[in-house]
Amino acid sequence: MSAARRFFVEGTQELGGVVEIGGSDARKIGRVLRLRPADRIEIVDSAATAFAASIDSIGSVVRATLL
């Protein structure tokens, strides 16, 4: 997956979990990359584990489910 669609989150995550992305990363997802719900991104947690994720909702906070 393109590095432009890779986002870093705090803490450790698990498959099936939901992550919330805010701030400038949320703006980048919604306005710069113009991604939409169901689009795929990559999430990297604090343990450097990478997950594929599907966007659930986009606003001031982006919610995505880890696949």
What positions do the PLM features span?
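N-terminal positively charged helical leader segments and presequences
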Residues: 1-67
